[in-house]
């Protein structure tokens, strides 16, 4: 039985817990929190809730520690730190900083003989794998990634920080005409604005200046200024009724040419349509936690990404079973 620890019990932590329930070879040992442990109610009755201050006392009880913090400030510190004491896995998703994050985790894991697996989820993660396969198969081609329709939690948080905003959800929406142009194999060169729109649902405080809020949203650099953005003001009741879930998804498409004269076009498309972003991400992470455990048992250490994990490590099946039923 693979023993799992979870650090952080937000949306992703709960998604991890649900994913463990659907396995036969894993069990949740403990959830670690920065909050008062008595205030954190988990679903797994046989697992403990403990303070993060006590986490090092569990080194002999946990095979893989899943880190569920945010990529902005939590994971850059936590993953290298806990790789000194545990086999670790995270969902670090700041693409530009992955090489730096990898190097830090690699140094920590190498020094102590542990196994680190970073940036696991769907993007980075499943989308990354599909880009690699598609690039290998169609070297003469181009990649296109579309996200949505789905809730962007980072963009939603950015709106909530605006004065006068009580709550907000931001949906990233692919532009259908751009999607179809890519699917046709035309390989169009598309700007940010041409690929996605942003749709915002905002609960404003009583008496707040809605026009000012809308202007702040639409002109916010790095978030909305480069996109066609629509803002809808709704009530708290409408938000709870219609926008309480965290759906997401997207498409990774590569179109390319083969033949001596590049006469034949091909399109490879991978699509995700998710009711719950954190629950799906949790399911991906738990499959890779199994791989981390197995690879470490084979003597492998240091940092890895999804590119380094053979598919057979992900399944709770023998090699014979995989060949018989899935090949």
Briefly describe each language-model feature range:
Residues 3, 14-15, 22-55, 151-289:
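C-terminal substrate-binding/catalytic lobe of Rossmann-fold NAD(P)-dependent oxidoreductases
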Residues 9-10:
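Glycine-rich Rossmann-fold phosphate-binding loop(s) that bind the pyrophosphate
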Residues 55-64, 72-91:
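Rossmann-fold NAD(P) dinucleotide-binding segment
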Residues 90-91, 116-120, 146, 169-170:
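General beta-strand structural signal in soluble alpha/beta enzymes
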Residues 92-116:
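Rossmann-fold NAD(P)-binding glycine/threonine-rich loop
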Residues 126-142, 157-167, 291:
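Oxidoreductase and adenylate-handling cofactor-binding alpha/beta cores
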Residues 262, 266-327:
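NAD(P)-dependent Rossmann-like dehydrogenase/reductase catalytic/cofactor-binding core
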